[in-house]
């Protein structure tokens, strides 16, 4: 995605096993009932000013849907590139990941600057993990020294689900992430980890909010 918009000639794909991957805007047109069932359900109820701002301006982003019992063979790779010539820009990407019961998937997200201009991105991600779903999400930040990103991640997990999120911040003037997790089903397990390698003049800040709503849930958290 370039500046928050999908530029591919084929913005959305659906495999034989029902997996849907690609542009959120394209998914909303092709599968409106599916997207409407989940879109903004978490950000609206749990969100803050960041999610509210994104909801107002968001037009596109990434969409991942893995049906019940499907094990995705390859990771879903999502690249957000930020590019401008001679002017400062802002983007508002919105991402929606849905993992149905018994599914397995891996998602790799890259946020990178493709020019030396100033860029500001306000990004929101909603993740739904149904019963016994397994999802690993790795997010990498590589921005230039003039660009910033603020993001909100909202995850809802049902019984016996497992979600592992790893955020790696390498470069960027400001990288701020708020991660909200709701463990709503018995036996749900969450891992929220981060590795921040900041230099002079850089600020990286992550906050986490993990709610053990159901009993016998487990959460682990490591940030360095």
Per-region residue spans from a language model:
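Conserved beta-strand/loop scaffold segments within soluble protein domains that form the structured core
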Residues: 3, 7-224
């Amino acid at each position: 995605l370039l500046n928050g918009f999908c530029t591919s000639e084929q913005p959305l794909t659906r495999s034989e096993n029902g997996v849907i991957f690609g542009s959120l805007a394209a998914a909303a047109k092709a599968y409106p009932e599916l997207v409407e069932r989940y879109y903004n359900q978490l950000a609206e109820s749990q969100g803050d000013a960041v999610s509210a701002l994104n909801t107002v301006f968001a037009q596109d982003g990434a969409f991942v849907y893995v049906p019940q019992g499907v094990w995705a063979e390859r990771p879903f790779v999502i690249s957000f590139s930020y590019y401008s010539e001679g002017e400062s820009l802002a983007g508002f990407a919105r991402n929606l990941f849905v993992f149905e019961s018994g599914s397995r998937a891996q998602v790799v997200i890259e946020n990178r600057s493709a020019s030396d201009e100033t860029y500001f991105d306000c990004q929101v991600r909603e993740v739904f993990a149904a019963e016994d779903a397994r999802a690993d999400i790795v997010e990498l930040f590589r921005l230039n020294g003039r660009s910033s990103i603020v993001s909100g991640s909202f995850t809802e997990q049902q019984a016996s689900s497992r979600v592992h999120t790893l955020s790696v911040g390498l470069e960027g003037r400001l990288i701020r992430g708020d991660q909200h997790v709701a463990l709503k089903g018995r036996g749900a397990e969450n891992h929220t980890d981060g590795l921040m390698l900041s230099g002079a003049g850089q600020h990286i800040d992550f906050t986490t909010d993990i709610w053990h709503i159901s009993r016998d849930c487990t959460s682990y958290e490591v940030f360095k």
